[in-house]
Amino acid sequence: MGKRTNVDLGPLPDLIGYVLRRAQLVVFQDFFAAFAPFDLRPAQFSVLTVIERNPGLTQSQVAEALGIKRTNFVGMLDALEKRGLAERRQTAHDKRSYALYLTAEGTALTRKLKPVIRAHESRMVGRISEEGRAALVGLLHEIADGKPRNAAKLKGPKASRSPRAGSAET
C-alpha cells in the first residue's frame, strides 16, 4: 500500500477549536524554544509578568486573573519561589492571605525576558498583517470573555432552525 499524502480532515479545518489548537502548537513550539535557556513555561512567564506589574496581589487574585486553578497555581508558585524568583509575604489585614512579590532575581529575570517575548511575538505577528493581528486578538478576546452573541447571526442550518422534539439534534 502506498503512502497517503492527502488526508481528509473533514470539518476540522473549519472548527475554531481545531484551528486554535493548531495555532497554539505553533506559538508554544516557538515559545518553548525561545524560553528554554530560562527554563520557563508559558504559565510561569504569565505569573511573573502579572506579579511584576501588580506587586502585592494575593495568590487568589493572580490565579483568578490568569484563569489558573488554585491547586495548580500553588504548585507553580512553589516552583517559582524555590527558584528564588518570587516570594509570598503574609498580608497585614489577613494572616491567612499572602501577597506576591518578585525577588531581586525575579525582577532581573523579567527584565531579561522582555526582549525575548518581544522577539517571540514578532515572529508570530510576522505571519500575519498588523491589521490581522489586531482583528485576531480582538476576536479571541470576544471568545475568551465568554459573552454570547446573537445566535441568529450565525450561518448554517442549526442556527436557523430549532430542533424538533424527538430529533437527534440537541
PLM regions: where:
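C-terminal regulatory/oligomerization modules of transcriptional regulators
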Residues: 1-8, 130-170
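N-terminal helix-turn-helix DNA-binding core of bacterial DNA-binding proteins
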Residues: 11, 18-21, 25-72, 83, ...
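Membrane-interacting alpha-helical segments
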Residues: 13, 70, 100-102, 156-167
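Charged, amphipathic alpha-helical coiled-coil/dimerization segments
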Residues: 28, 56, 78-141, 145
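Compositionally biased intrinsically disordered low-complexity regions
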Residues: 30-33, 78-81, 164-170
